[in-house]
Amino acid sequence: MAAENPFKENLTSLPKPGGGEFGKYYSLPSLNDPRIDRLPYSIRILLESAIRNCDNFQVKKEDVEKIIDWENSSPKQVEIPFKPARVLLQDFTGVPAVVDLACMRDAMNKLGSDSNKINPLVPVDLVIDHSVQVDVARSENAVQANMELEFQRNKERFAFLKWGSNAFQNMLVVPPGSGIVHQVNLEYLGRVVFNTSGLLYPDSVVGTDSHTTMIDGLGVAGWGVGGIEAEAAMLGQPMSMVLPGVVGFKLSGKLRNGVTATDLVLTVTQMLRKHGVVGKFVEFYGDGMEELSLADRATIANMSPEYGATMGFFPVDHVTLQYLKLTGRSDETVSMIEAYLRANKMFVDYKEPQQEKVYSSYLQLDLTDVEPCISGPKRPHDRVPLKEMKSDWHACLDNKVGFKGFAIPKEAQENVAKFSFHGQPAELKHGSVVIAAITSCTNTSNPSVMLGAALVAKKACELGLQVKPWVKTSLAPGSGVVTKYLLKSGLQPYLNQQGFHIVGYGCTTCIGNSGDLDESVSAAISDNDIVAAAVLSGNRNFEGRVHPLTRANYLASPPLVVAYALAGTVDIDFEKEPIGKGKDGKDVYFRDIWPSTEEIAEVVQSSVLPDMFKSTYESITKGNPMWNQLSVPSGTLYSWDPNSTYIHEPPYFKNMTMDPPGAHGVKDAYCLLNFGDSITTDHISPAGSIHKDSPAAKYLLERGVDRKDFNSYGSRRGNDEVMARGTFANIRLVNKLLDGEVGPKTVHVPTGEKLSVFEAAEKYKSAGQDTIVLAGAEYGSGSSRDWAAKGPMLLGVKAVIAKSFERIHRSNLVGMGIIPLCFKSGEDADSLGLTGHERYTIDLPDDISKIRPGQDVTVTTDSGKSFTCTVRFDTEVELAYFNNGGILPYVIRNLIKQ
């Protein structure tokens, strides 16, 4: 069991200038170990955490040594424990987390223990930002109208979260309409350095959203984890992680005139994807750092999941301190942060000579080489230089269906869909823009690109250009500060004139909450099989995510979103072709509306002020009248309503006893689905709209829910019945068992029937037959969606055999008791001749002590084939989870024993 901290003699006082002390801290220099000076800054944060939390039980002295010896130990894939300083949630992932906590309290109660042991031990911040939809756009009243609809749809969920904020200690809930979680985290919640009862330590955070990495731009170590892992971290469990390699990314030079931070991040994303950084930290350094504003850094850090890294880390320097002052942190706080980080060798001062850090590998980018670009049409790392966009688009129309292809026959490529839009003649072609959204924390946190977009709108208005009325335009800032500086600059009216009215403060289009297109537009697209485009300043553009009818989705900077909205198509060469005709009848080109870097800098300087941040965040937890009027039950145990279609008691702990179920293999399982590469968590557990013919729709209709009130899958994650039916329900699912047919169906192997995935799974379960899933590379990439593991578990899936897994998803599968297995290098289902019509036996020992992390096992089929796979339990702790039937039963049993 836990002992006292062996490093207590390293506890040192941090003096205040002018007398007194800021507090005590665990001093890295007092260890007198020269290896620490060579460590990357990101690894120093892990080291400090290990020293501070060392109790020779959860965190051992040898763990500290592994981190100090990072240079030698990181290539060996060693495991370390990490205890983050706090946990961050948003409402889509927060609702199921609070449901699980409430359910764990019930389980503790039933097992005769104290249910109040289930309480967050670290600060938990939950920001409600994922529920607002763009129902109303292009209207002065859009914010209010969308918020009223948001509350009508989500009243029950919001009341449940409000109950949670009262029932659990240490939990702050930021009400709807306040902003996007990662931007609120950057501008307000991020501490950089904690001072808890006189103990100083670096802020660090894990969040149930993959873009938690945005906070890395502020020098705070943070990354996305599954909801299941986050719940364990809240309850004081150390997170088990492999000590990561760190890629050193050197930046030099400065961005050319007219090039944006978004162009830079799309370039960095492509470079890092190519380099291969999955499971690694990326740490930025070099002279170019001084040219990047903190918002630019946050934009790059935000997209870590898109380049595949665990973190994209920017150590704290003078730029960070300036930003902390700008965003209203007090002078006293900023001086404590600087003093602590300097004293503990965690501050970078570019005015001083830099000691060489050691990195696992190195990359370099001269900022002057970055050129304007966008990414798409289906993946964030498929970057296209702006000057090549037209030719790339035509290649995409020609290419066979794939990440860069739509397979439109040559004779159909010039088709025009003519229709009437509210009485006025309108037309759509392949590439016509039907959604243009300035959205997402990635970019709305960055004043230079937001004000850049407003300047494009202003120039367009002055020249007489106008966005066509059938383009669904929207602006959804990540915090109220954006509204304040857009108004202060006098530029918001120009955005309004082009249809970019503010529609709400939340994720909106970036996560698929784009709302309906006008019926006439939808019909024109569907009836004529048009490949319509969405252009958004988001961070993800996977198929079917932004809107079911936009097959081409491009990520672009906010000013480019406005430019493409004005052009009305992505089928344009901005260098050579005019965007439109001005009021004088002359052609207007891209160069005529594009602002210079100097113009943007001037407006940023005069419009973005510290008071805006102070006044916005002083009132953030006060909520709004609709939030304040929500009535919630009191009591620390939740009263489940069996008729609720939003909040339902899940079955995870139904028959739980104090005895773990133990390890087990899989015998004679059928294949539920057979996939190729790049199956995302969006494919496994979609967040967007509930299709009218889906099993989830049938369930809701049977319970008296109108179609208009279905809401989204994301909003119903507190109901396991809906979510089990929504598992593998993505309309773009490609399952090899269906021989080329696209859609959320599968073949029930014993009968050969074609059924919905849910119906097939139920059939297997009622016959007592286990199932597995076959997959290709990058299985589970995308959002850190714990329902992508919970759902398959509820469907009876016992194992997933893939070429490779995305980091968060693999740990989520383990957390739910599903076995992740990898084919051997160079092998996959196709090369082994597996069709998915076989039965599979996985030969795993029944005794957990006989299983090692990463060991090989034999898989045999009833057709006589046998092959070797690697079991992806990566750590001893993960084996303990598996033995217990998952991470949450493990935590409950441990808490009862304490």
Curated annotation (Swiss-Prot):
One example of the protein's molecular function in GO is: 4 iron, 4 sulfur cluster binding
- Binding sites annotated in the UniProt record for substrate: Q90, D209, S210, H211, R540, R545, R703, S784, R785
EC primary class:
lyase
Write down the Pfam families for this protein, in alphabetical order. Aconitase (PF00330), Aconitase_C (PF00694)
Kindly list the cofactors needed.
Answer: [4Fe-4S] cluster
Name the GO cellular-component terms. Answer: cytoplasm
Query: What binding details are noted for the cofactor?
Result: Binds 1 [4Fe-4S] cluster per subunit.
- One GO BP annotation of this record: glyoxylate cycle
The UniProt entry, under InterPro entries, shows: AcnA_IRP_Swivel, Acnase/IPM_dHydase_lsu_aba_1/3, Acoase/IPM_deHydtase_lsu_aba, Aconitase/3IPM_dehydase_swvl, Aconitase/IRP2, Aconitase_4Fe-4S_BS, Aconitase_4Fe-4S_dom, AconitaseA/IPMdHydase_ssu_swvl
Its biological purpose is as follows:
Catalyzes the isomerization of citrate to isocitrate via cis-aconitate.
- This one is known as Aconitate hydratase, cytoplasmic
